[in-house]
């Protein structure tokens, strides 16, 4: 989540794109960086105003006299943020979160929290417009794991229903057929957290 001073944003919208060759950006601390085509940036119609998921730019930064704000709540590809962060030796609270992968459904929650905080600090604040651009849902991770594998690794035999119920409490959808559990992880565990049968095993082991 990042806030921009609307009066300094040129044009009617902000854009997320890869930087153009030889484009530059002045960061909040005054440092000027030279961008490459691999860097993801937030732009107005004039050019970059923030290094996506890492640092804000100085041009549209929030000042003491700011009264008109654009609130950007977004999600970015983990690899893109990681590569840009390494290139500029930048590691921020935001970039650390993005590098780990974020459930895209958390974007709505982030927006709601941002609005709530604005209203708490500035009760007179009015929200005049909203736009959802290029929404992409997090694909839920699907993993098949056999009952025999679980019994062997857990060191004890659990009832089929107990396994299904345990995973269900963690937000998984589970179907058991012919000795195989077909598990579908919740979105908030599908950004790299759950990807193989050992991950499913670990979820069960910590609760039984």
Label for each model-derived stretch:
Residues 1-208:
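RNA/tRNA-interacting regions in translation and RNA-turnover enzymes
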């Amino acid at each position: 989540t990042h806030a921009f001073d609307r009066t300094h944003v040129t044009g009617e919208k902000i854009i997320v794109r890869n930087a153009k060759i030889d484009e530059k950006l002045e960061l909040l601390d005054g440092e000027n960086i030279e961008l490459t085509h691999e860097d993801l940036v937030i732009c107005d119609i004039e050019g970059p105003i923030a290094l996506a998921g890492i640092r804000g730019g100085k041009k549209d930064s929030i000042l003491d006299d700011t009264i008109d704000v654009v609130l950007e709540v977004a999600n970015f590809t983990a690899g893109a943020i990681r590569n840009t962060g390494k290139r500029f030796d930048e590691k921020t609270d935001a970039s650390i979160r993005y590098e780990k992968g974020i459930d895209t459904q958390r974007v709505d929650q982030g927006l709601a929290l941002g609005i709530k905080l604005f209203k708490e600090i500035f009760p007179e604040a009015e929200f005049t417009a909203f736009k959802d651009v290029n929404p992409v849902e997090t694909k839920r991770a699907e993993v098949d794991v056999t009952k025999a594998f679980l019994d062997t690794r857990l060191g004890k035999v659990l009832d089929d229903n107990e396994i299904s119920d345990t995973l269900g409490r963690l937000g998984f959808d589970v179907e058991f057929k012919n000795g195989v559990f077909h598990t579908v992880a919740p979105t908030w565990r599908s950004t790299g957290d759950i990807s193989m049968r050992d991950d499913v095993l670990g979820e069960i082991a910590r609760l039984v």
